[in-house]
């Protein structure tokens, strides 16, 4: 009898080889829509992407609500920005998820900002400077060169987590890289006229965009990062624009448009709503659309007299 | 024998195949490993190349300003320590300086500013500072809840009038190792007493939705119980928590929580503990003085709404628990309770924010119902009458509160609550207590201003009718500030 059991076990063992790769798609929990979109580009049908926040939400201020906890619990990979952007809610999600795979330091925990060069790194972080991030400005997704860097790292991570499909991920990544390089060449050519254009930002959310396009931020509507614009500060910005004029004022889709609109009206400059992430505007349906639409809006604004 | 032969033949045939499969799978896994290594190196190379290109592009602008040309060199020479120099550079030079500056940072850009050396592994530290101005129409020293027997040391009602320091809370937290994290909350009371509010280790690696906590922690029963006082929406906890759970139930023990593998949020929890505080009493027994079971479910309704609701049960044993009471003649007596308490808590919370963006406006509605059954015996009037007798009581309490953020930084909240001591069965001591039937009520209004995520100033007005025939009008002015590590708050 024992022999027969052994035999059956031996015969059945190879079945496991079939059983293992048959498991469901890799579940990716993305903190922000841009990383959800990127994971979808790189994973295609091999991944099942769920995005924690929408383009209409402030990624700094999300609640660790039950629906997010359960999605973190079921995730194979948590893909977030990092650089303390999600510090007010992601640690709670991970703690309460009971999911060992996605804890910090595990392969299932991916922070995009680890793979790019960060700007605005404060020398001596202090809260008197507002809600500054010690690791640098976390809004890295506004520069397509950063997306390219993160894509390389995220692709490698997907292959590491799901080695059985490494070849497919590699192919998707090569395909994406090629399309992205072409798109970047197109965007760079389109954006030549934006170089050196002075602008005002509502929140310090576009440093990477400016770094890429060579635009110049001459003022910020928030008196300190994360502090709502006050009437007196808006007046200050308005009067400072007399000495250093700006061509436009930028705000993100999730933000209250009123401070920017006030400045636009009083300073007589264009007001530009930046989609900021995938889903932030009609045109920003995917990562390509995000930059197509961002550039189109900036070009329209800069073309105005 | 007959069966063994074909079996042996089959075995002999299969084994080499198995072995072959083994080697080929070995080769496959080796190949995969090499592939992933190659991919990782390619990724790093590509990243480095792109950085190099950008650095070159940044270093050779057509006509660099003096500051822009000088700054990069200085920075490259002395590494990331000079990052403080960037803000002082002229605005026009900053975009040029910044890229070069970061190129000098190490290839793995992980938190370079953490401070290095022995301090690199320091736990995150945060300190909550809080202070109060209290004005009450009744003397807080004589505060009592009519019809309720509560332990002597239990803080109910406002603590003191005038200016006072509220609780100062020091919180430390860090990963212990790849499998555990640890956290401690040290509470510094205004009367210079130090107490350990929470001090626990928690697993991060059990997986399958399990998480185990050991040490001292706030029980997960109800909604408000696990929340630290600086996250409360009002200055004080509801009367029901004060009278039924000793303000907040914390214990030393173990807590296991499990999230079943569902798409719907369900969290189940079980706790065992020492039973060190009211409604239990610290008796030093070998077994558990407290057990608790919790169940919570929650989810979203569209993009703008979310909810959580739950049911919890807490059992606690009390040995020789001294209770302050008022007898039928209106005199203050001390009774002794021995027995067990079971508290049921139903809790629900609903939150709304337009498109889930709570930056500008949001609303939350929460309510809890607590019902406790205390059974055992009560010795009436310790030191004087000393009359023992059976005792059974089923007190209950509830609150409903709504908090509305009507514009950024400003919130207004309203809370209404009540208590019901029920009809306690004092057995042979019945004649010593008044009939009761009085139901305490309290209404509270608060408005708070939050200049930033880290600071809050609050004004609270309350009309407290916990004492029969007496209305206590209370005014609180409170500040709460948070220093250090950015706290992450639970739902």
Per-segment meaning from a language model:
Chain B
Residues 200, 305-491:
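Outer-membrane beta-barrel pore domains
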Residues 26, 33, 49, 56, ...:
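A broad helix-preferring feature
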Residues 89, 110-278, 285-303, 313, ...:
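Outer membrane beta-barrel
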Residues 279-283, 297, 334-335, 354-356:
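Short helix-to-loop capping/linker segments positioned immediately adjacent to catalytic or ligand/cofactor-binding
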Residues 21-145, 150-153, 265, 483, ...:
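N-terminal periplasmic/intermembrane-space "pro-region" immediately following the signal or transit peptide
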Residues 268-269, 279-284, 321-324, 379:
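A short secondary-structure junction signal
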Residues 284-293, 326-328, 383-384:
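Short, surface-exposed, charged loop/turn segments at secondary-structure junctions
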Residues 2-20:
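Gram-negative bacterial Sec-dependent N-terminal signal peptides
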């Amino acid at each position: 009898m024992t022999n027969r059991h052994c035999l059956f076990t031996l015969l059945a063992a190879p079945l496991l080889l079939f059983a293992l790769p048959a498991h469901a798609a890799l579940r990716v929990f993305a903190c922000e829509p841009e990383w959800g979109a990127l994971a979808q580009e790189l994973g295609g049908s091999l991944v099942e992407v769920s995005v924690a926040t929408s383009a209409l939400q402030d990624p700094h201020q999300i609640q660790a609500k039950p629906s997010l906890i359960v999605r973190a619990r079921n995730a194979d990979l948590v893909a977030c920005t990092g650089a303390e952007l999600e510090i007010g809610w992601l640690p709670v999600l991970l703690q309460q998820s009971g999911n060992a795979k996605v804890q910090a330091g595990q392969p299932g925990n991916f922070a995009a900002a680890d793979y790019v060069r960060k700007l605005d790194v404060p020398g001596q972080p202090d809260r008197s400077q507002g809600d500054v991030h010690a690791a640098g400005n976390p809004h890295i997704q506004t520069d397509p060169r950063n997306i390219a860097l993160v894509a390389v790292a995220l692709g490698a991570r997907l292959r590491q987590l799901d080695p059985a499909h490494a070849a497919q991920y590699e192919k998707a990544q090569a395909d994406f890289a090629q399309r992205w390089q072409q798109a970047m060449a197109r965007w760079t050519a389109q954006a030549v006229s934006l170089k050196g254009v002075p602008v005002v930002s509502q929140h310090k959310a576009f440093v990477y965009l400016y770094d890429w396009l060579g635009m110049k931020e001459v003022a910020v509507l928030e008196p300190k990062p994360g502090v709502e614009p006050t009437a007196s500060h808006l007046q200050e910005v308005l009067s400072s624009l007399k000495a250093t004029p700006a061509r436009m004022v930028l705000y993100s889709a999730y933000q209250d448009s009123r401070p920017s609109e006030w400045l636009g009206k009083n300073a007589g400059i264009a007001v530009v709503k930046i989609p900021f992430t995938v889903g932030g505007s009609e045109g920003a349906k995917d990562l390509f659309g995000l930059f197509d639409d961002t550039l189109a809006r900036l070009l329209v604004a800069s073309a105005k007299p | 024998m007959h069966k063994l032969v074909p079996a042996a033949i089959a075995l002999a045939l299969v084994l080499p195949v198995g072995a072959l499969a083994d080697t080929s799978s070995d080769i496959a896994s080796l190949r995969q490993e090499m592939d992933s290594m190659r991919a990782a190196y390619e990724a790093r190379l590509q990243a480095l190349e792109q950085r190099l290109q950008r650095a070159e592009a940044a270093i050779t602008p057509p006509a660099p300003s003096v500051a822009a040309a000088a700054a990069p060199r200085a920075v490259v020479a002395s590494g990331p320590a000079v990052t403080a120099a960037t803000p002082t550079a002229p605005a026009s030079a900053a975009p040029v300086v910044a890229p070069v500056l970061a190129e000098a940072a190490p290839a793995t850009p992980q938190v370079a500013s953490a401070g290095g050396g022995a301090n690199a592994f320091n736990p995150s530290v945060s300190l909550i500072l809080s202070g109060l101005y209290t004005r009450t129409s009744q003397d807080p020293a004589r505060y009592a809840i009519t019809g309720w027997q509560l332990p002597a040391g239990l803080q109910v009602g406002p603590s003191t009038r005038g200016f006072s320091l509220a609780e100062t809370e020091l919180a430390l937290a860090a990963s212990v190792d790849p499998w555990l994290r640890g956290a401690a909350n040290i509470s510094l009371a205004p009367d210079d007493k130090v107490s350990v509010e929470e001090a626990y280790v928690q697993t991060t690696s059990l997986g399958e939705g399990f998480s185990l906590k050991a040490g001292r922690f706030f029980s997960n029963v109800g909604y408000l119980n696990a929340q630290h006082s600086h996250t409360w929406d009002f200055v004080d906890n509801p009367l029901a928590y004060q009278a039924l759970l000793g303000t907040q139930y914390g214990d030393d023990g173990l807590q296991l929580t499990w999230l079943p593998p569902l798409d719907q949020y369900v969290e189940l929890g079980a706790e065992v503990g020492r039973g060190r505080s009211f409604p239990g009493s610290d008796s030093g027994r070998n077994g558990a003085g407290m057990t608790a079971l919790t169940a919570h479910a929650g989810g979203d309704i569209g993009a703008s709404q979310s909810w959580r609701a739950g049911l919890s049960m807490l059992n606690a044993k009390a040995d020789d628990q001294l209770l302050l009471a008022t007898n039928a003649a209106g005199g203050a007596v001390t009774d002794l309770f021995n027995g067990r308490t079971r508290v049921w808590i139903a809790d629900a919370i609903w939150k709304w924010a337009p498109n889930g963006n709570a930056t500008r406006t949001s609303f939350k509605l929460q309510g809890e119902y607590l019902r406790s059954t205390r059974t055992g015996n009560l010795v009436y009037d310790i030191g004087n009458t000393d009359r023992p007798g059976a005792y059974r009581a089923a007190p209950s309490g509830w609150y409903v509160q709504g908090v509305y953020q009507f514009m950024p930084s400003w919130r207004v909240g309203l809370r209404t609550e009540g208590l019901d001591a029920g009809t306690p069965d004092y057995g042979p001591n019945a004649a010593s207590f008044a009939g009761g039937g009085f139901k305490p009520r309290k209404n509270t209004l608060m408005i708070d201003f939050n200049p930033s995520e880290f600071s809050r100033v609050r004004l609270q007005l309350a009309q407290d009718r916990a004492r029969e025939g007496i209305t206590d009008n209370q005014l609180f002015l409170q500040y709460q500030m948070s220093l250090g590590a950015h706290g992450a708050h639970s739902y």
